[in-house]
């Protein structure tokens, strides 16, 4: 599943394609959304926001399209009039004079009013987004030490969107390698230096992954230039200590780590 950096890059692509342009055609697959088709003609997308792995497309009439891709959903940008070559099932079409954005295969799609946006169950449940530039290491440290999270093992905590939105398995793996910790640690057991390093890594690594999107290399995760240190590198040498990277399972997800320098 794409993680926060990949979702944010997708949002950037959607914004670049249609932001500020009048919508000339709107289509929704789900019957409960069809009533909004005529309401959106002539309106425009003001911005596309991410909350972890959810995407919020905001319109000029104050409506917001909520979508969560889950495992299978994908957004695509095409020239208006062009057919997208795919066997996926189309769920949403937002068309402007020159560009059209298409959402395929997703099932978690809703239209929200401003009031509903503030009370949506998923949006209320998720924690601060790691790509939010206003989120600081100090705030992350406070969350790590809060009664709600301080006794949680990192193996599960770093996958919990209620802790920090936008983290996922590859980020969990890379963050813990960066700070030299295994997944069985808890925030309450760390010393001040470890806690500080973890708080910074929880923001620095997702933001670096997002920022290095300039070129595409299909051999790297979701086309990002972000280079894995341990993820999917089991059996290879650790570049930090020369140990052999191993693969195991933590919180029902594959976990990659170096026994030589992660303790």
Curated annotation (Swiss-Prot):
Its EC number is 3.2.2.-, 4.2.99.18. Keywords: DNA damage, DNA repair, DNA-binding, Glycosidase, Hydrolase, Lyase, Metal-binding, Multifunctional enzyme, Zinc, Zinc-finger. The keyword Transmembrane does not apply. The active site is at residues 2-3, 53, 253. DNA binds at residues 70, 125, 169. A zinc finger (FPG-type) spans 229-263. CDD domains: EcNei-like_N. Binds 1 zinc ion per subunit. Pfam families: Fapy_DNA_glyco, H2TH, zf-FPG_IleRS. It catalyses: 2'-deoxyribonucleotide-(2'-deoxyribose 5'-phosphate)-2'-deoxyribonucleotide-DNA = a 3'-end 2'-deoxyribonucleotide-(2,3-dehydro-2,3-deoxyribose 5'-phosphate)-DNA + a 5'-end 5'-phospho-2'-deoxyribonucleoside-DNA + H(+). InterPro entries: DNA_glyclase/AP_lyase_DNA-bd, DNA_glyclase_Znf_dom_DNA_BS, EcNei-like_N, Endonuclease-VIII, FPG_cat, MutM-like_N-ter, Ribosomal_uS13-like_H2TH, Znf_DNA_glyclase/AP_lyase. Its cofactor is Zn(2+). One of its GO terms (molecular function) is damaged DNA binding. The keyword Lyase applies. GO terms for biological process: base-excision repair. Belongs to the FPG family. PANTHER family: ENDONUCLEASE 8. Involved in base excision repair of DNA damaged by oxidation or by mutagenic agents. Acts as a DNA glycosylase that recognizes and removes damaged bases. Has a preference for oxidized pyrimidines, such as thymine glycol, 5,6-dihydrouracil and 5,6-dihydrothymine. Has AP (apurinic/apyrimidinic) lyase activity and introduces nicks in the DNA strand. Cleaves the DNA backbone by beta-delta elimination to generate a single-strand break at the site of the removed base with both 3'- and 5'-phosphates. This is Endonuclease 8.
